[in-house]
């Protein structure tokens, strides 16, 4: 009790008052500790009043003793409660101090581990060797060495889903050599070949620089004029049919958006 904060700290006044009250209640009242004064008896005085006064005096002695015992028990319980609260507070402060000491030691070890060695190459001016250790030390101090919080801090972020690649657009070869080029390159859209073949067979002299529109899908019979002989139409259809089945060695490239 000599080094107890209850006697030295801000609670010293309350504990001192409780101790004084306890000592005051344990001390007997002066009416009970004083000796009764014997009164001179006369021969004519009867002894009956002595018997009557002896009973209230005995009751007066029993009542203060019971009240003092109850007050002493209450004070003892209050003092035990204060001592238990002081013990819990001291244990909590010691545990907090131990955690802080462990966090400081771990931060120093991480800082020493992250410091550059003599065998390491020189760092750039923008590199900070103390940054990883400082960040991890701050995370440990915030988590208070909690394994769950530390695991949540160290779990890597999930990788982002791969973005789809945009479709490849190619104008393809133009001019009178489209048929020969189509036989050698199987990665050509059949719809575009059908459109270009129809334009060539009709003898149109318009420039073919721009690709065919997406929604312009006409059959070969509509593009062909009435002056084209039937055998040429049959040959064109057979060539388009052969182009629609490319070889499986090279994957077909998409020229138009789906």
From Swiss-Prot:
Residues 204-213 have a biased composition (Low complexity). The lineage of its organism: Eukaryota, Metazoa, Chordata, Craniata, Vertebrata. Residues 156-188, 204-230, 239-258 are annotated as: Disordered. GO terms for molecular function: serine-type endopeptidase inhibitor activity. ProSAAS(1-180) increases secretion of enzymatically inactive PCSK1. The C-terminal inhibitory domain is involved in inhibition of PCSK1. It corresponds to the probable processing intermediate Big PEN-LEN, binds to PCSK1 in vitro and contains the hexapeptide L-L-R-V-K-R, which, as a synthetic peptide, is sufficient for PCSK1 inhibition. Pfam families: ProSAAS. Residues 1-33 form the signal peptide. This is ProSAAS.
């Amino acid at each position: 009790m000599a080094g107890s904060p209850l006697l030295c700290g801000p609670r010293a006044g309350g504990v001192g008052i409780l101790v004084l009250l306890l000592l005051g209640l344990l001390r007997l009242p002066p009416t009970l500790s004083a000796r009764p004064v014997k009164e001179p008896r006369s021969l004519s005085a009867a002894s009956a009043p002595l018997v009557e006064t002896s009973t209230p005096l005995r009751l007066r002695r029993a009542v203060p003793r019971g009240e003092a015992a109850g007050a002493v028990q209450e004070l003892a319980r209050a003092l035990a409660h204060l001592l238990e609260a002081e013990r819990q507070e001291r244990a909590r402060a010691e545990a907090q101090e131990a955690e802080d000491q462990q966090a400081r030691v771990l931060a120093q070890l991480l800082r020493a581990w992250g410091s550059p060695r003599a065998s390491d190459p020189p760092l750039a001016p923008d590199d900070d060797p103390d940054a990883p250790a400082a960040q991890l030390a701050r995370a440990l101090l915030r988590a208070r060495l909690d394994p769950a919080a530390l695991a949540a801090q160290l779990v890597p972020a999930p990788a982002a889903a791969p973005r789809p690649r945009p479709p490849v657009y190619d104008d393809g070869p133009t001019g009178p050599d489209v048929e020969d080029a189509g036989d050698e390159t199987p990665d050509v859209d059949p719809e575009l070949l059908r459109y270009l073949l129809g334009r060539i067979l009709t003898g149109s002299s318009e420039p073919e620089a721009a690709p065919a529109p997406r929604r312009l899908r006409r059959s070969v019979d509509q593009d062909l004029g009435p002056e084209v002989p039937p055998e040429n139409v049959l040959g064109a259809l057979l060539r388009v049919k052969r182009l629609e089945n490319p070889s499986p060695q090279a994957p077909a490239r998409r020229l138009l958006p789906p």
